[in-house]
């Protein structure tokens, strides 16, 4: 009886329904993974990281040396970074990197500035790559970007140093020995995973120039940290059993080995970013396969945003871009960001001195066609299942008129167009 019930059509249908949404989500994420060229982006970042690793660590340690409390922790902080982010077979890499970093201390002022510029370029590339995943079209303003990059470059080392000091205090005061010794070993084994998850959570939460939900960034950080640990174990196994770097390159084998590891790291980081992006923008509702062609696709959303800015303006207040992105005007926050950027770029709205948005055109004289003709291509299309803004009777009448006009104009048989195109070919 139980076997019959388990294999019933209803049970099979429920099981299919449970698997349908995860399958659609993975398909959505895979499409964006391919579209964003994640593997190529990871290779580009790995190459730039390889060139910037020594300058970045040198600048970070120089910043820490400014504060006496961190001055004696150089080796501890280096060990912290290698323990959490380097593979198990990284002893040789660690030795070479420390040699390179020690040599940077003899550089002149110009050389030091050059190291800072290289480090900032790496942070800028990471910023542009992650914002590309979140489909941010407009770059950060120069001062805003510089402030963010400089904050990361200066506060990042301080946070790491503070973490090392705090963990050392807890380590030697709470887990001094005795019955807590076993707990000390257990905590030690989980620290790299926890530290990696926190670092990636902050990366996904802070860097994208979009609103990212806390739980999405946290889930992405945990997933990427787990993948990170798997990558470390696989890399250690691969190097120990299959890698031929040393046989081919000899003493230089550390360079391709380090590049390969950094490449794996960036694949994991960018995969986690795609996971977080997909959590925010995936909609499991399937589109209507028989949906009628809509010549005004995207226009109601643009007008909804313009209307929200206008209504706030005439009421005496101004909507900021941040408030718009956190509002429920459009469920698809990525498309909402594109609309705001389009309206600002084409001077339909402008930012006030207080950072609010104000309508910049005369809505009584400007026509819909003037708006429509300037809309970028990406606003005319949407991902399957993404919600649209409901519109009124005027739009329905306009759609019917456009469809009728298109139908009358496009009565030409396709063979005539094909022949005409063939005749024009050289």
Swiss-Prot record:
Family: Belongs to the UPF0761 family.
Membrane-spanning ranges: 50-70, 106-126, 146-166, 187-207, 217-237, 250-270
Organism of provenance: Chlorobaculum parvum (strain DSM 263 / NCIMB 8327) (Chlorobium vibrioforme subsp. thiosulfatophilum)
Subcellular location: Cell inner membrane
Protein name, UniProt field: UPF0761 membrane protein Cpar_1343
GO cellular component: plasma membrane
UniProt membrane topology term: Multi-pass membrane protein
Upper lineage: Bacteria, Pseudomonadati, Chlorobiota, Chlorobiia, Chlorobiales
HAMAP family, per database record: UPF0761 (MF_00672)
Major localisation: membrane
Domain of life: Bacteria
NCBIfam families: yihY_not_rbn
Stored InterPro entries: UPF0761_bac (IPR023679), Virul_fac_BrkB (IPR017039)
Pfam families, per the entry: Virul_fac_BrkB
Keyword vocabulary terms for this entry: Cell inner membrane, Cell membrane, Membrane, Transmembrane, Transmembrane helix
